[in-house]
């Protein structure tokens, strides 16, 4: 449905192939404009490269960039933020500024949410839903409980990125 797609630290071809195929289908069918912060290689559809710099986000949210008007004039813009962006020092700033800009321009509402996060692992979203990870600072709350002997039993289903040290 989207008529404008912006990738911020996301590479859907490698991180979410189904999403990438839907973006491609949308491009072929609707000639959707697609932008990416930085050149992320062949996505199987054309996209315009934006300088990979946090300053550009500030320019966009301050209405000092060409993309500002495109987002505002778009009926259903889609901004996809890669999970890796949220881990950098300016990650929270980037996410919050985009969220505030989109909310103030009615691009996040009951009908459409323009701001999306592309998770690195399928299990990550479920981990947030179950309260295993803190969405505020990314801490592994369950692992903290285990270290403090506050859990009797733990089932690990699809925890792709947990690292355990072997005890000798």
What are these model-derived regions, one by one?
Residues 1-22, 26, 35-75, 80-168:
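Extended redox/cofactor-interaction regions of prokaryotic respiratory oxidoreductases
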